[in-house]
Amino acid sequence: MIQIKRALISVSDKSGLVEFAKFLNQNGVEIISTGGTLKLLKDNGIAAIAIDDYTGFPEILDGRVKTLHPKVHGGLLGVISNPAHKQKMEELKIPKIDLVVVNLYPFLKTVSKPEVQLEEAIENIDIGGPSMIRSAAKNYKHTLVLTDPNDYKEIQNLISSSGISEEISASYMRKAFSHTAMYDAAISSWFYKQSGEVFPDVLNLSFIKKQKLRYGENPHQAASFYEPLFTKSDFSPLQGKELSFNNMLDFDAAFHISSLLPENTVCIIKHLNPCGIAYADNPLEAFQLARRTDPISAFGGVIGIKGQVNGELATSITENFVEGVIAQKFTQEALEVFSKKPNIRLIEIQDFKEALDELDLRPIHHGLLIQDRDYTTITEKDLKVVTKKQPSPDDIRGLMFAWSCVRFIKSNAIVYTEENATLGIGAGQMSRVDSVQLGANKALNVGLSVVGSYVASDAFFPFRDGIDTLAKAGAKAIIQPGGSVRDEEVIQAADEHGLIMVFTGMRHFRH
């Protein structure tokens, strides 16, 4: 058991500290402290020794050097059960420090400010704090280290009852090393970001556990949700069951797709694939257009809405079973409608804007693949008309909408659209011509005609068979990257069928 007789306290986050320090004083614990922490303690009538009085060495360099002293680190690292350590500490008059209460300069909070300057960031890099934390954590069998104000109450209870066991101290040791690792990762990441280096030679990733999930993709898989250091989720849950692993993936997909498309866009997601996308003058009309694409697959889906959900739209949504809705805003009337279906998960995120600097991370065996997210867009000026038949301005708008949809569909991806709504989606087929046929069949199965439709392909057509198939279905125009060794054959097929075809020069594979 660790007997707490002496504590060193030096914190930036002072929440809960006064009550905790008073408790330590009342239990006969001698407190050593520094700077602003010392002032707070004394202002509240708590006995404490200044660090420079303790070490006999003044704080120097504007407070940059306060605790980097053998009397501090000897007291933290000394193993009292080791006779040689004990003898040397007595010889040098180094008392044992049993408890360290330290949290670090607010580097992350500082660099999160848009106007932060380099010098301010540098001055918020803590040196002495991490050193004390690491020393105490290394010697956890004899020294307790606290880095989180939320832990003060538990330690008070333990000191008052069963005491501090080695096992308990070990749990705080793990938390302490995670704290310093996270701190260093934040510093490293920020400086790399300032340099413009997207893919550094050494990648430090720090994530904070936000919540434990009920299970993973399947009930036999454990799962949790973690947030990266520099990003705080602004998803606001309004009602519904706890989010599952699969729910979170689908909500994220619905947000990504909706955020990159025009106002009043609605997309319906099932297993990470869109089964309907549309935009209109209002979200209700867009929802109706998106749902008609594949109403069977929309059953049990997640709906993303770049706009406001009112009572009328909520009523339309609840006519069928859905897992959840993510939108910019829900009116009070909408919430009253949804309250009658309390299991429907509602997420509000007012800033429906994609973070365009996010990276795409994918673990593989013994490694991690990282790439830029596929956010690059094209304009009408990037289109190259390759057929004899030329597109009208309306055709260009329809083709651009189709192109904006196909990038979100699993490869091989084909989508048939009107000017503002999907008609049929062919997703995830190993053969492109099969995706062409699937998309047409999906539309026909729900009574939608693809005659006069716009067709987007996420990658080039390797053979003319895809063109022949979509022409037979009645498509009017095609947008695709081009770049096949058989482009001439594909263009010839389009000309034979009197189709419009444009090349984008950009592929949108989605593995």
Curated annotation (Swiss-Prot):
Pathway: Purine metabolism; IMP biosynthesis via de novo pathway; 5-formamido-1-(5-phospho-D-ribosyl)imidazole-4-carboxamide from 5-amino-1-(5-phospho-D-ribosyl)imidazole-4-carboxamide (10-formyl THF route): step 1/1; Purine metabolism; IMP biosynthesis via de novo pathway; IMP from 5-formamido-1-(5-phospho-D-ribosyl)imidazole-4-carboxamide: step 1/1. Keywords: Hydrolase, Multifunctional enzyme, Purine biosynthesis, Transferase. One of its GO terms (molecular function) is phosphoribosylaminoimidazolecarboxamide formyltransferase activity. CDD domains: IMPCH. Signal peptide: none annotated. Residues 1-147 form the MGS-like domain. GO terms for biological process: 'de novo' IMP biosynthetic process. It comes from the Bacteria. Transmembrane segments: none annotated. It catalyses: (6R)-10-formyltetrahydrofolate + 5-amino-1-(5-phospho-beta-D-ribosyl)imidazole-4-carboxamide = 5-formamido-1-(5-phospho-D-ribosyl)imidazole-4-carboxamide + (6S)-5,6,7,8-tetrahydrofolate; IMP + H2O = 5-formamido-1-(5-phospho-D-ribosyl)imidazole-4-carboxamide. Gene3D superfamilies: 3.40.140.20, Methylglyoxal synthase-like domain. GO terms for cellular component: cytosol. Its EC number is 2.1.2.3, 3.5.4.10. The keyword Magnesium does not apply. InterPro entries: AICAR_Tfase_dup_dom_sf, Cytidine_deaminase-like, MGS-like_dom, MGS-like_dom_sf, PurH-like. HAMAP family: PurH (MF_00139). Belongs to the PurH family. The IMP cyclohydrolase activity resides in the N-terminal region. This is Bifunctional purine biosynthesis protein PurH. The gene is purH.
